[in-house]
A protein has these predicted regions:
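Anion-recognition interface
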Residues: 1-262
Length: 262
């Protein structure tokens, strides 16, 4: 394999839109010898991030996947990376693209990242390139907490402090770059700035150019606006409601209230 591209986020830098476009064009990309792993139905390879926890730890994703012990995590790791190895062997791609913001936001230690690299190499990956989009920490906090409000969480002023546990690990850009370059090498880091004032099409164009994909290789109509933020007025109203009621949390699954506020 000529190249393995790990797109590691950050959270709130348009990852969902990128992943959706890649997943919808998987067959088209294979014709150009570019593999987008079929493991992730949404295009988000978060399973590989969770499988790289070293050591095992419990969080919302491990609970959702019913990974309750180190032994279960080890079995999960083997299944996930064996499946990736089988995909690589079946398609013999020149390039593999793996995308998940959870690579950055969940793999916080050198041991985690080393485990990811080791497992990927055993699956047949090589020639790594780490692609990360950095964004103004305050903008990340605002977007992150806006999503939390839509899920029924009451956000207070303390949430916007950089040391708050919901965002501290995401906005510490220096630590992120130090950790990933320590494992994969400075020369393999591709650090870019999120195009803050531009539309999603600018981000998509930048991503495709960076990973070496021509737009002519894709069906660009297979795009979707994802994770649209509510207006400031709507968010404030919703946040005040969250302070007094769990109604929003209960409605979050069908998004009825969000549609009324947007």
């Amino acid at each position: 394999m000529k190249q393995t591209i790990l797109h590691i986020g950050l959270e709130k830098t348009g990852t969902t839109s990128i992943q959706y476009l890649l997943r919808q064009n998987r067959e088209q990309l294979l014709k150009s010898s570019v593999l987008v792993s079929e493991q992730a139905a949404s295009g988000n390879n978060f399973h590989l991030a969770i499988a790289s926890y070293s050591p095992f730890r419990e969080d919302g994703l491990t609970r959702a996947l019913r990974l309750t012990s180190a032994e279960k995590l080890e079995g999960f790791r083997k299944r996930e990376f064996d499946a990736l190895a089988a995909e690589i062997q079946a398609t013999s791609p020149a390039k593999l693209i793996l995308s998940s913001e959870h690579f950055q936001s969940r793999l916080l230690s050198l041991a985690d990242i080393k485990q990811l690299r080791s497992s990927l190499e055993q699956a047949g990956c090589s020639n790594f390139r780490i692609l990360v989009y950095l964004r103004d920490p305050l903008k990340i906090a605002m977007s992150h907490h806006g999503m939390a409000i839509k899920k029924g969480i009451h956000v207070t002023e303390s949430f916007y402090r950089p040391e708050h546990p919901r965002i501290s690990h995401i906005v510490n850009h220096r630590q992120t770059l130090e950790n990933w370059s320590a494992v994969f090498g400075d020369e393999n880091m591709d650090v870019r700035l999120y195009p803050e004032a531009s539309g999603s099409e600018v981000l998509i164009s930048d991503f495709l150019e960076t990973v070496g994909i021509e737009q002519s290789q894709l069906d660009m109509s297979k795009q979707e606006v994802r994770n649209v933020n509510l207006s400031a007025v709507a968010l404030e109203a919703l946040n005040q409601l969250n302070a007094k009621s769990d109604r929003v949390r209960l409605l979050a699954e069908d998004r009825w209230l969000f549609h009324q506020l947007e």
